[in-house]
């Protein structure tokens, strides 16, 4: 059984056989669901918690609303 991976940028589940696996020079493996996520993280150096359409942003927003 093949396990589903989560996108390293937006946190969305990636179906087996789809997406992009990116390996950094230091050996870290990053999984991306789309070219949009890959470009935002690799080329534009954006942090997921500051981009409004990511799961990490929404989780942080919920935490702020509770306090």
From Swiss-Prot:
Binds 1 zinc ion per subunit. GO terms for cellular component: ribonucleoprotein complex; ribosome. Pfam families: Ribosomal_L24e. This is Large ribosomal subunit protein eL24. InterPro entries: L24e/L24_sf, Ribosomal_eL24, Ribosomal_eL24-rel_arc, Ribosomal_eL24-rel_N, Ribosomal_eL24_CS, TRASH_dom. It comes from Thermoplasma acidophilum (strain ATCC 25905 / DSM 1728 / JCM 9062 / NBRC 15155 / AMRC-C165). Keywords: Metal-binding, Ribonucleoprotein, Ribosomal protein, RNA-binding, rRNA-binding, Zinc, Zinc-finger. One of its GO terms (biological process) is translation. NCBIfam families: PRK14891.1-1. It comes from the Archaea. Part of the 50S ribosomal subunit. Forms a cluster with proteins L3 and L14. The keyword Hydrolase does not apply. The keyword Zinc-finger applies. SMART domains: TRASH (SM00746).
């Amino acid at each position: 059984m093949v396990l589903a991976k989560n996108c390293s940028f937006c946190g969305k589940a990636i179906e087996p056989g789809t997406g992009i696996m990116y390996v950094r020079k230091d050996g870290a493996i990053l999984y991306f669901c789309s070219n949009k996520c890959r470009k935002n993280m690799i080329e534009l150096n954006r942090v997921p918690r500051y981009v409004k359409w990511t799961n990490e942003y929404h989780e942080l927003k919920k935490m702020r609303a509770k306090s």
